Every structure is written in C-alpha cells, then in structure tokens.
C-alpha cells in the first residue's frame, strides 16, 4: 500500500501517461508494449494496469531477449508475468544466436544491431504491430530529447528526425499507412527522479539489481562490470572483487556499468538521485561506441 498520496506533479504526469495509453488503445488496431524489465518498464506497466482497470491492458507485452540480460532480470520478468497473468512475448534473434553473436568477440555495436535492433524489427513485422509503447524519457539522452511522444516509423521501422509531426496541446497524429508504425513514449516528460519517486509512492516492484548489494565486479575502462555468469572472459591478471554496488540502468550485463552505492531502500535511492550529477546512461557502454550512436541506432529501428 502506498505510504503517501501522490504529489500534484506526479498526478499530472500519471494522468498524461494514462491519457496517451488510452489514445493508443482507441486509435490503433494492434498495439504492443515493449517491456525491457527495467524501472521505466515497471512504471509503464503499472500505469497501463491503472489506465485500463479493472480490465487487463488491451495489448500484449513484447520483450527482446539479447541472451545477455542479467539473470535476475529474466527471473523477475517471468515472475511478473505469472503474478499478473500477462502475456509477455519473447523475441530472440535465433540466427544471431546460431552465429554466436556476442559483445565480447563482436563488439557492442554489432551485438546490439543483431540481437536487439534486428530482433525488435522482426517482432514488429511478424506480429504486425502498428504502435509500440516504449519507456524512453527525454531527460535520458540528446536524441531522445528531440523525439516526439508519437514517433513515426517507416516501413523499415526506421526513425527520421527530420520527418516528425507537430504535437500541439496534447493532440497526436495517429494516421499511418499500411506497414508503417508509431513508437509511443508515455514517459517522455518524466525525469529519472520522477520515476523513482513514483516507484516509491506507488510501491512498484523492481528488479533487485537496482538496490545496493555486494556483487562480483571487474573494473574495465572506468566501468564496474558485474560477473553475472561464466561467459564473461577474464583478462590476464583480472580477478572479480566484491563491491557494494547497484545499477541505475539495466541492459546486457557485459555492457552495463554498476555504481558504488549503499542505497538499499527506495527512500535511499531517491535521496541519492537528489544529488546525482551524472546521467543514468553513463553506465551504458552501447551509448559510447561511436559519436551520435543512439540516434544512429534509432534510425535503424532501435527502441
């Protein structure tokens, strides 16, 4: 049960997000929610459950499994699906898995392209989704800051930042041709702090990796990489150290850096966020593989 009522600020954000979700449900034939298992997905799912209560959300959840997600993420995903009775469709690029594509031998750029972007495009095409909810926020990264809430994608699922529609006074253009689609970002106007305060006040379950705990990590290029399984190759003389760390953002474990932290409760995480001076995505290695990489990925069909 929530310990305190929502602030006026969070109530306004919640109302806007639920309005967007209901608009999509009314205007599109085959929407889907992209579920990455992280904190933003947790908030987005919670909002969907509230927006359509007492019914279930009128769309499935789609998870793209790169095969390198943290084990705790997959365990959490399956538990949430069972607890809430939701349909979560899981997409894996089987061709990429057969080729042994991985971030160690092939690098983060190719791994992300094959195991995430191509897998997502395949799922979008096969299921004929015409709208897909995503948990991106404008405060995360510069290319996301300029993206519309209703983001038009062409028949190849690509994003053209020069081909965007005006969004005035919460009016959204939902018209598309066959084969085109819209990526919808109901959390666009939320900040990382908003997300954590909402999780705290709504008592939303999240992956335990967000809480500080002693975990085996190695330091590489200034990032603390958690040794989540035996696939992480050790360099000469390298040995995992147990450190008190947590994650601000979650993705493929070899490409996601932890931060040293003692925040083990939601209240402590919120306090930590009040003094944070770095972006949460500073720990995502895929954002550093080339200049403008996020925009390039989105042009190719990335989340």
Swiss-Prot record:
Region feature Disordered, mapped onto this chain: 282-303
Transmembrane segments: none
Entry keyword set: ATP-binding, Nucleotide-binding, Nucleotidyltransferase, Transferase
SUPFAM superfamilies in the record: Adenine nucleotide alpha hydrolases-like
Signal sequence range: none
A Pfam family hit: PAPS_reduct
InterPro entries for the chain: PAPS_reduct_dom, Rossmann-like_a/b/a_fold, SO4_adenylTrfase_ssu, Sulfate_adenylyltrnsfr_sub2
GO process annotations (BP): hydrogen sulfide biosynthetic process; sulfate assimilation
Family, per entry: Belongs to the PAPS reductase family. CysD subfamily.
Function: With CysN forms the ATP sulfurylase (ATPS) that catalyzes the adenylation of sulfate producing adenosine 5'-phosphosulfate (APS) and diphosphate, the first enzymatic step in sulfur assimilation pathway. APS synthesis involves the formation of a high-energy phosphoric-sulfuric acid anhydride bond driven by GTP hydrolysis by CysN coupled to ATP hydrolysis by CysD.
Assembly: Heterodimer composed of CysD, the smaller subunit, and CysN.
HAMAP family: Sulf_adenylyltr_sub2
Name under which the protein is recorded: Sulfate adenylyltransferase subunit 2
Species the sequence originates in: Maricaulis maris (strain MCS10) (Caulobacter maris)
Source organism phylogeny: Bacteria, Pseudomonadati, Pseudomonadota, Alphaproteobacteria, Maricaulales
Gene that this polypeptide is encoded by: cysD
């Amino acid at each position: 049960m929530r310990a305190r009522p929502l602030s006026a600020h969070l109530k306004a954000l919640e109302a806007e997000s639920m309005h967007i979700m209901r608009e999509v449900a009314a205007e599109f034939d085959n929407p889907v929610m992209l579920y990455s298992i992280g904190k933003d997905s947790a908030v987005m799912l919670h909002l969907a459950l509230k927006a359509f209560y007492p019914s279930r959300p009128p769309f499935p959840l789609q998870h793209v499994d790169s095969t390198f997600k943290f084990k705790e993420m997959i365990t959490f995903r399956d538990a949430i699906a069972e607890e809430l009775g939701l349909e979560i469709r899981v997409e894996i690029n089987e061709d990429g898995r057969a080729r042994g594509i991985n971030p160690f031998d092939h690098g983060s750029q190719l791994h992300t392209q094959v195991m995430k972007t191509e897998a997502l495009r395949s799922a979008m095409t096969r299921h004929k989704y015409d709208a897909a909810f995503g948990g991106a926020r404008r405060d995360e990264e510069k290319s996301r800051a300029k993206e519309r809430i209703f983001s038009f994608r062409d028949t190849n699922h690509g994003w053209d930042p020069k081909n965007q529609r005006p969004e005035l006074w919460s009016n959204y253009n939902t018209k598309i041709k066959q084969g085109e689609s819209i990526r919808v970002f109901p959390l666009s106007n939320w900040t990382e702090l908003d997300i954590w305060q909402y999780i705290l006040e709504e008592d939303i379950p999240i992956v335990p990796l967000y809480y500080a705990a002693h975990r085996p990590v190695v330091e590489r290029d200034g990032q603390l990489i958690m040794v989540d399984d035996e696939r992480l190759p050790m360099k000469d003389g390298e040995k995992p150290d147990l450190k008190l760390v947590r994650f601000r953002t979650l993705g493929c474990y070899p490409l996601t850096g932890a931060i040293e932290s003692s925040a083990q409760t939601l209240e402590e995480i919120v306090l930590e966020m009040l003094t944070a001076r770095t972006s949460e995505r500073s720990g995502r290695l895929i954002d550093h593989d080339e200049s403008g990489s996020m925009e390039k990925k989105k042009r190719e069909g990335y989340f």
